[in-house]
């Protein structure tokens, strides 16, 4: 009698956390520390920002409470999302066998076939989550990203955008830097978040002018522009830029929530097929703290 291999597996709540984490936190922006992560938001969380002015006064014998305290609040409410996929085992079996036999270039070997499938799906979710963070809009399978949220907020510092290439990238980046409030300029966690096309344009410009005394055949590491760190955000749409501090941008999810679930369901025992259903349920969303501390480029 032939041996039947079933790979039906369920992870729920806290036990699903490591798989959900791999799916949501592996994108370019989060993996490289571009945002403040709030990992245990069960429903909603208040993002608070405290500002003080007039805090230092002339000395006197009296207590003079004359400074102004401003507390800004915005609501971070991650959206419930899910993945429902049906995959055919035979489409992955050759790759899986190669990994098990050591013929693959991957360093981290999955301990089981279900983890291999979950890892495959998690990679796709991470890519989609990166896009949602910067350009998402409330629709099927998405949440409002920073571009959408900021476009609706008149309190931001808006710079008119244009098509960016190697010939104008320095001028356009300079417009963003010039618009940054003096109180933010020089802060360690201040970044200009740029899309791939702006990053490549700046790198090409540096190559043409011999940046860092390097030629066209040498790699040029881009770290800053006019003293402000450059962060390439893969999910940011072309010709858009955002300048602010890391602590002003928040990503929320609920890694320990009971509503999180990862399930791999082998359909062989149910309908005789070679199909495997992969199910993920999770929450994700973004929010910023103070719009006045954000410079946008090309985001109306």
Label each residue range with its predicted role.
Residues 2-57, 149-161, 167, 203-300:
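Sequence/fold signature of self-assembling virion shell proteins
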Residues 55-115:
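Long, hydrophobic/aromatic-enriched structural stretches that serve as scaffold segments
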Residues 88, 92-95, 194-198, 244-245, ...:
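Helix N-cap / beta->alpha transition motif
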Residues 95-96, 130, 201-203:
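Short helix/loop capping segments that flank catalytic or ligand/cofactor-binding pockets
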Residues 98-179, 296-300:
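Alpha-helical scaffold segments that mediate packing/assembly in large oligomeric complexes
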Residues 133-138, 188-195, 215-219:
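Short coil/turn segments at secondary-structure boundaries
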Residues 174-206:
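Ordered core of a single globular domain
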């Amino acid at each position: 009698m032939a041996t039947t291999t079933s790979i039906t597996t369920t992870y729920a709540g806290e036990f699903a956390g490591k798989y959900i984490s791999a799916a949501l936190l592996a994108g370019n922006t989060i993996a490289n520390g571009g945002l403040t992560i709030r990992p245990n938001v069960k429903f909603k969380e208040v993002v608070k920002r405290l500002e003080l002015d007039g805090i230092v006064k002339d000395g006197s014998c009296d207590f003079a409470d004359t400074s102004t305290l401003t507390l800004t609040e915005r609501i971070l409410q991650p959206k419930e999302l899910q993945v429902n996929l049906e995959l055919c085992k035979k489409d992955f079996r050759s790759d899986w066998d190669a990994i098990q036999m050591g013929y693959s270039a991957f360093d981290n070997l999955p301990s089981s076939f279900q983890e291999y499938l979950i890892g495959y799906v998690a990679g796709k979710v991470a890519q989609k989550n990166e896009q949602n963070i910067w350009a998402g809009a409330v629709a099927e399978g998405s949440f409002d990203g920073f571009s959408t949220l900021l476009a609706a907020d008149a309190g931001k510092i808006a710079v008119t955008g244009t098509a960016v290439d190697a010939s104008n990238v320095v001028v356009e980046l300079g417009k963003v830097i010039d618009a940054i409030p003096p109180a933010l300029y020089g802060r360690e966690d201040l970044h200009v978040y740029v899309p791939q096309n702006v990053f490549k344009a700046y790198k090409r410009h540096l190559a043409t002018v011999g940046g860092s005394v390097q030629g066209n055949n040498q790699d040029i590491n881009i770290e800053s522009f006019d003293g402000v760190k450059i962060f390439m955000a893969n999910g940011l749409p072309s010709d858009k830029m955002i300048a602010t501090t890391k602590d002003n941008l928040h990503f929320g999810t609920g890694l320990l929530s009971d509503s999180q679930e990862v399930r791999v369901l082998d359909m062989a025992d149910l309908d005789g097929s070679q199909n495997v259903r992969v199910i993920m349920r999770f929450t994700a969303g973004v929010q910023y703290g103070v719009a006045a501390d954000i410079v946008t480029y090309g985001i109306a």
